[in-house]
């Protein structure tokens, strides 16, 4: 999940008034804030799920509400996964559109390395998980895509904390990798985790989607017009059997990424001149705080609560081949996939690593990219179902993989930061960080 550029001034007509609301919005849009809130929600869920309040937590998580006639009588946890995460995927759709139309993915030669890295970090972990679970039966193999996603909120937070001395292009590489990764994850969910499709609701969903697309192309950004259209599209996609978060992506991709006289936002720049920004930027500024500050942490709170059952319960989960496959795939598979694919593609004519980077930097980043959480838990729920025999194993595997990847990647990047700092000052570089 990539946050909008905080350096760009906020266009007018923002729904948040200046003052506390605007400051809160900027705070929630920061790279580190989303990761911290996600961590707090995860820890809180784990503590409550293993406390005397565990029964209350399960009752709240399983409480069902919503209009039954529209097939929207969902549990609280399902509303978080299907509803709130649609906001997260809407922001992802905005970022995909921006990067492919006007960003770093527009130039094929520049995009080749992170695209190859993203492909490697999906293929290699999926292969490792499959190999480990070959003898566990077809049910276990349904989770092959769990280690295929990176939680960019956590990953960027780690880089922001330990990578202040690293070249800025490393963060750009991570963000570009995340954009492609999000696209692959969306495709996997749509293709492999859709049980059956009801074509009538799916065709009906094209109506609000088309109206939404026409309106935003004409520069309409009134929330009271666009939000009802988005909700209608979401409900119809949900009724079709396709995971409802795909509606969020589709809506984001419909927003124009180039500022025009009709579809753009005008504001006065620092030099007093009027400037125009694309609607993707406008919507990302408004929805990113809601995504990182509310949608993703709430989803994490209702998804990460696993009852460990003491040391014996933890040991039991860790002996499950699903958990082992997830941990090894997240930690080793992603690092091998990203670094290996990048090394291979960098040998092609016209493609090379940025001169300010070294391959040890990419290796450290590849471990940080092993931090999978939001989409990994979502795929786990789609693969096995909430409350299934593998449910706890998925959560334990994802959490341990996240922690291990963060520690290894954070340590490597901190050492690389020391190397770059010493190199910039022309000082002797300690052997431990070369």
Swiss-Prot record:
GO terms for cellular component: plasma membrane. GO terms for biological process: regulation of pH. It is found in: Cell membrane. It comes from the Bacteria. It is a multi-pass membrane protein. InterPro entries: Na/H_antiporter_dom_sf, NhaA. One of its GO terms (molecular function) is sodium:proton antiporter activity. The chain crosses the membrane at residues 34-54, 74-94, 112-132, 143-163, 173-193, 196-216, 222-242, 245-265, 294-314, 326-346, 362-382, 393-413. Its main location: membrane. Keywords: Antiport, Cell membrane, Ion transport, Membrane, Sodium, Sodium transport, Transmembrane, Transmembrane helix, Transport. Residues 1-15 have a biased composition (Pro residues). It catalyses: Na(+)(in) + 2 H(+)(out) = Na(+)(out) + 2 H(+)(in). Residues 1-21 are annotated as: Disordered. Belongs to the NhaA Na(+)/H(+) (TC 2.A.33) antiporter family. Na(+)/H(+) antiporter that extrudes sodium in exchange for external protons. This is Na(+)/H(+) antiporter NhaA 1. It comes from Clavibacter michiganensis subsp. michiganensis (strain NCPPB 382). The gene is nhaA1.
